[in-house]
Structures are given as C-alpha cells and as structure tokens.
Swiss-Prot record:
Keyword presence, Lipoprotein: yes
Chain residues carrying a lipid of type S-diacylglycerol cysteine: 25
Function: A putative lipoprotein that seems to be specialized for the initial steps of macrophage infection. A non-acylated fragment (residues 26-185) binds phosphatidyl-myo-inositol mannosides (PIMs). Limits, in a TLR2-dependent fashion, bacterial uptake by host (mouse); this effect may be mediated by nonacylated fragment 26-185. Plays a TLR2-dependent role in host phagosome maturation arrest. Plays a TLR2-independent role in chemokine production during the first 24 hours of mouse infection.
Organism of derivation: Mycobacterium tuberculosis (strain ATCC 25618 / H37Rv)
Any GO BP annotation: symbiont-mediated suppression of host innate immune response
Signal peptide: 1-24
GO molecular function annotations of the record: lipid binding
Domain comment (free text): An extracytoplasmic domain (residues 26-185, without the lipid-anchor, either periplasmic or extracellular) decreases phagocystosis by macrophages; when added exogenously to the deletion mutant initial bacteria uptake by host (mouse) decreases to wild-type levels. When added exogenously however this region is not sufficient to restore phagosome maturation arrest.
Any Pfam family hit: LppM
UniProt gene name: lppM
Name of the molecule in the record: Protein LppM
Principal location listed in the UniProt entry: membrane
Length: 227
C-alpha cells in the first residue's frame, strides 16, 4: 500500500550556527529542489566576514552516513569565508541527519510531509540571537509543480523564497500538488502489465492462426471447394 504521508525534518539549523556568529556579519543561503520522486538536492552556504586573517569562518563536516551524496568545500566570496555544501538525491529520511554537519547548529527547523498528492513545507526560524541587522539569511525552495499556497515570495510559479529577518522569529509555509511517486510507480507497473498481457494475447492469436487447420474442406454439395 502506497504511503500517503511521509515526513522528514530538514533541520537546516546546522547551517546557521547563529550562536557563534551572533556578533559578526552572517551569510546563510540555502536552496533546495524537490524532485517529482520526493528526492531533495540543494546547496548550503554558511559564511561570515573573517575577524582576522586566520579566520576561515564556519565549517561544515561532510562526515554523514550518506557522505557519497554530499560534497563540502571552502567558501570565499565578497569578503565572506566559510563552507559550502552541495547535496543530491537525499530522501526525506536522510535530511534530518544534515544537522550532524555542525555541532553548533541552532536556529531553523523545516519539515516536509506528504498528504496524498500534496506536499507541505512548514518551518520556523528563530533568529533572535542574531544581532547584526545586515545578516543575510535566505531560503529558496523549488517544487516540481506550481506552488498552490505560501507565505513566502514566489519568484517563479514553482519557486518560493524567504528572506529571514534577524532578531525575530519567522515562520515558513508552502504547498504544492503533484502525484505521489509511489502511486505513480504503481500505475506505471499496471500499464506495463496491461501491455504485456495484451502482447501475450496477440502472440497466442498469431500462433493459433499459424497452426490453424489448412486441410481442404468439402462444400455442402460434396464438391471440393474452388480456389
């Protein structure tokens, strides 16, 4: 039976590391893309302006159970330094483990859940510990179908963005409707089974036609049939 609800905590809190960066300029940009198969790929940037020449900014650890799906590299752009993590094809169940990439994680929690053909994103961002009014904290989510409702900014029909304000608690919500991949797979299997059955019936019919009785038959008058 196909599951109609699937829940996974995205827990991107580990990306913010707000406590150690509360007094410095902060840049956190997270972008995630949800595929029609309910797999999530994306990119995380966690960076800050260095306090000195030896400051390399916040670090993300790629040592997670699905490390083959995650690539972590140094980030250095526009005077910000830190880490950049790129991940691909994560399941809803794997996403919570991204929190293990940094032990100082705090600040943001997101959840994705499915209810039939509707995927619901809900989140809460507590940035009360961020004192820098110029902190750049941004989340972008791309769905595989048009967003039906959201409290974020729709930059495209399928893409929603939140620019989170420092010093306050923000909430995020969005919904999109697209077919449950489990249901779609079941339907596809049924179609192929139908095609296979139809093809098998065709083969049987052809074989029956080939093996039909080709012996001459007498007409009702007893005369042999004319050709």
């Amino acid at each position: 039976m196909a599951r109609t609800r699937r829940r996974g905590m995205l827990a991107i809190a580990m990306l913010l590391m707000l406590v150690p960066l509360a007094t410095g300029c902060l840049r956190v940009r997270a972008s995630i893309t949800i595929s029609p198969d309910d797999l999530v790929s994306g990119e995380i940037i966690a960076a800050a302006k260095p306090k000195n020449s030896k400051d390399t900014g916040p670090a993300l650890d790629g040592d997670v159970p699905f490390s083959q799906k995650v690539a972590v590299s140094n980030y250095d752009s526009d005077g910000y330094v830190g880490s950049q993590a790129v991940f691909s094809d994560l399941t809803f169940a794997e996403l919570p483990q991204l929190a293990n990439m940094n032990s100082d994680a705090a600040g943001v929690n997101l959840s994705l859940r499915r209810n039939g053909n509707i995927v619901i994103l809900e989140g809460r961002a507590d940035l009360t510990s961020v004192s820098d009014p110029d902190a750049d904290v941004e989340l972008t989510v791309a769905f595989p179908a048009a967003v039906t409702s959201t409290n974020g900014d729709r930059i495209e029909p399928e893409v929603v963005q939140w620019k989170l304000k420092p010093g306050v608690v923000s909430t995020m919500s969005a919904q999109a409707r697209y077919t449950d991949p489990n249901t779609r797979s079941f339907t596809g299997a049924g179609i192929w089974l139908g095609i296979a059955a139809f093809a098998a019936a065709g083969v049987v019919a052809v074989l029956a036609w080939i093996d039909r009785d080709r012996s001459p038959r007498l007409t009702a008058s007893g005369d042999p049939p004319t050709s």
